[in-house]
């Protein structure tokens, strides 16, 4: 927490927050008080992210005798339409007032197909040259999306002589949480599971789950920081 480094206070604050948290399902109205109800919708940013629809009941109309309501939508980051693992965010049916995070709103991003091609090109070159690909990545969201796309590439092109190392204890913890929450994955990811594939737990994947292991790994690679490393297996003869 940014407000203090006092471990005792942090523990107390977190305990209080935990008492106040109420998990809600997506797409169901929840009454907060007689004049307000809310509904969560998938935001497609990270697993579990949501935007909030708030319906405020106003005063009764004098002409029609009906109560007028106002729909307000709040959202933080919104994900792309075809992000790996995540259901695509859908626009709300109605919004009278929209409050939206827009840090990268004016930028055009590569489509998923182009990103896949770029990733495949870099990893295949590393396999051919017996090299290493280092990918800095956020511990939550981006790491899991990359693992999903890398597993697809290894499966499609039958690449076996490669190690994929997630060199971040925090990312390893978030990846384990993603695996536990499979029911919130999108249909494409669930189809892979039914076929016996494991997009976040494939054979070539290795994760550092302690700080000590992370320090050893960065020392042996001669680099600092956290992220993913795709390393060609020097003991193999080549991919099929």
Give a label for each model feature.
Residues 1-71, 75-240:
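Acidic/His-rich, metal-assisted hydrolase cores and their charged scaffolds
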């Amino acid at each position: 927490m940014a407000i203090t480094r006092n471990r005792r206070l942090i523990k107390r604050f977190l305990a209080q927050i935990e008492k106040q948290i109420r998990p809600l399902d997506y797409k169901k109205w929840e009454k907060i008080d007689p004049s307000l109800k809310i509904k969560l919708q998938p935001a497609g940013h990270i697993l579990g992210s949501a935007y909030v629809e708030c319906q405020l009941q106003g005063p009764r109309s004098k002409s029609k005798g009906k109560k007028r309501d106002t729909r307000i939508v709040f959202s933080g980051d919104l994900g792309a339409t075809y992000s790996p693992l995540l259901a695509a965010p859908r626009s709300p049916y109605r919004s009278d007032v929209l409050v939206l995070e827009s840090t990268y709103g004016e930028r055009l991003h590569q489509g998923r197909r182009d990103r896949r091609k770029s990733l495949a090109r870099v990893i295949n070159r590393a396999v051919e040259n017996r090299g290493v690909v280092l990918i800095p990545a956020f511990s939550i969201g981006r790491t899991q999306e990359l693992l999903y796309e890398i597993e697809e590439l290894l499966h499609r092109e039958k690449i076996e002589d490669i190690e994929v190392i997630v060199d971040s204890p925090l990312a390893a913890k978030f990846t384990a949480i993603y695996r536990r929450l499979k029911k919130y994955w999108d249909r494409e990811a669930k189809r892979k599971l039914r076929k016996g594939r494991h997009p976040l737990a494939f054979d070539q994947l290795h994760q550092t789950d302690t700080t000590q292991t992370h320090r050893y790994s960065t020392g042996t690679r001669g680099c600092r920081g956290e992220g993913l490393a795709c390393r060609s297996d020097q003991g193999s003869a080549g991919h099929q």
